[in-house]
Amino acid sequence: MIYQEENQHLRIGLASPEEIRGWAERTLPNGEVVGRITEPYTLHYKTHKPEKDGLFCERIFGPIKSGICACGKYRSIENQREYSKICEQCGVEFTESRVRRYRMGYIELACPVTHVWYLKRLPSYIANLLAKPLKELESLVYCDLFLARPIAKKPTLLKLRGLFKYEDQSWKEIFPRFFSPRGFEAFQDREVATGGNAIEKGLASLNLQIVMDRAYMEWRNLTEQKSTGNEWEDRKIQRRKDLLVRRMELAKNFLQTNMKPEWMVLSLLPVLPPELRPMIELGEGELITSDLNELYRRVIYRNNTLLDFLARGRSTPGGLVVCQKRLVQEAVDALIDNGIRGQPMRDSHNRAYKSFSDLIEGKEGRFRENLLGKRVDYSGRSVIVAGPYLPLHECGLPKEMAVELFQAFVIRGLIGRYLAPNLRAAKSMIQDKEPIIWKILKEVIQGHPVLLNRAPTLHRLGIQAFEPILVEGRAIRLHPLVCAGFNADFDGDQMAVHIPLSLEAQVEARLLMFSHTNLLSPVTGNPVSVPSQDMLLGIYVSTIRSNRGIYQNQYHPYDYRNKNFSYKMFYFHSYDDILKAEKQKQINLHSPLWLRWQVDLHIVTSIDREVPIEIQYESLGTSSQIYENYQFRKNRKEKILSMYICTTAGRILFNQQIEEAIQGFFEVSQHRSRPLPAIIA
């Protein structure tokens, strides 16, 4: 937690070993430094009291009961004398028990351990920075392979280079004759590395600026290359370019945040406060505990065993030490993310342990359940339904919800107009739902934007601003086109409504967050508000035309007995004539018809050189050329006298709606009597 300008905010990132030690280590009033956990014990099996230097140690995490030490002595917390702050016998501070909710401990690992999130999660940050295959790094992390010359800049005695197996270490039988035990250990750490130690040395030796420059040079060379014509090779080159871009971004982020890549390898393991991984006593002395305690115990057991092996020196076989390092790595992996490598660790009942990742991820995790799901004032929640009649920037707010959200504004309006003498009378009028309330409410919400949010808010478009209008019912009405930004649909989804109170918040909502100003994706730049699902189906149904079109009045081979099968196509001169005929049931939405069109307008057709279906000549020399979607009437000099296009009433209505949205309703109503400049034919 970071405190800056009296505002608390949370920053998640890599922590250095010094930071981890600073979280946990404390100096007691008697000068003793506590914080390191060395014993894998929790509670004593008889007394059920925390074991010293264990996972519930009161010296490290604080007393279980406020003001009472481990040996049962009581001191007043308000007494600030120096000798009363700590028990001289057990070393427990006389303080409040709530400190056990935030005081941490740490485990000093006998060997560096790679953080499994940065190794196994995709993309693998460690593999990206080291430019090594993930399988090769996994074999190195879990001690299946050894790395010779881990620090390339230093001179070495061995001629080995790169990776090799444990069986290839013939030098281990020769070099001990020329070194003292300590000298041989120093030589071995310098020349050969495996496990997290090898990864740590490789990351520490990186120059991030050089990594960025080399990745950029290679990316530029690949970009300048022309296409090979081979689809497989082009895909391979594109994948390589994407990898280089990710490497440059990763190195840039490390440089900007002043974090070091070697911090992705743990040498100190933080231990959560005991109140966050409790052990509870049930009846008859039975205990239930968090899975994290069992996983921490396994780490400490294996770490202490490795410490014993290393303390014995050369008397311990090298293969045993290597095997124990792998066990420590696997124990830490299970603690952080159990099952990420395949088969998870299980208890005696064959139940997989819940790791740290299981506790924080998902809908019921620590972040979404406890930190992000808080209720706030001036907010509400309801189901969303479609409101296709609404403009893009408006939403339908139920009256029952609006009067609660804007209650403070309504009360101010009632008292300001002397309709209510005091606060109590104004609230009584609102509860009785007097008619004057709705009038004032309409005035209050006019020009006052509201914020709609749909959880989870994964990107900027997850919360947008709208102008509210009052609607009946209890559901929030929303235009279907804005659902894509929220990733919402009308199958029972809920949305939260928030009221921006300050003038600054309202201005920000109006200028930056209105839905009609967020039509493009901030990530890709592609349109977000596009028709989909029932909108596309409705547009298709309203603009569909009979399959036979102008051929309906020709002989039909399947209905030769039906003499009334021939269909007469009507001719119209304006939009209004078509709409009147449709209302009078003379035509339907899908009936083909001829609409008079302006001669000087160009007709777009899918056929470049279309041949007329029929040509009719009249006695005065005029002629009519009939095509599939339009027809001309010409004089003797081939001058076009009139033109008609084949369309439907449904397409006329659809085109009219588009024009009203673009030009405005009043402008369209003034020019509706004459043919409009565009139509779907």
From Swiss-Prot:
GO CC, alphabetical: chloroplast; DNA-directed RNA polymerase complex; mitochondrion
Family assignment from sequence similarity: Belongs to the RNA polymerase beta' chain family. RpoC1 subfamily.
Identification of the protein by name: DNA-directed RNA polymerase subunit beta'
Entry keyword annotation includes Transmembrane helix: no
Example GO BP: DNA-templated transcription
Requisite cofactors: Mg(2+); Zn(2+)
Main enzyme class: transferase
Assembly information from the UniProt record: In plastids the minimal PEP RNA polymerase catalytic core is composed of four subunits: alpha, beta, beta', and beta''. When a (nuclear-encoded) sigma factor is associated with the core the holoenzyme is formed, which can initiate transcription.
Encoding gene per record: rpoC1
Amino acids binding Mg(2+): D489, D491, D493
Cofactor note: Binds 1 Mg(2+) ion per subunit. Binds 1 Zn(2+) ion per subunit.
Keyword check for Iron-sulfur: no
Reactions the enzyme catalyzes: RNA(n) + a ribonucleoside 5'-triphosphate = RNA(n+1) + diphosphate
EC number(s) stated in the UniProt entry for this protein: 2.7.7.6
Signal peptide: none
Organism: Anthoceros angustus (Hornwort)
Binding site for Zn(2+): C69, C71, C87, C90
Gene Ontology MF terms in the entry: DNA binding; DNA-directed RNA polymerase activity; magnesium ion binding; zinc ion binding
Role description: DNA-dependent RNA polymerase catalyzes the transcription of DNA into RNA using the four ribonucleoside triphosphates as substrates.
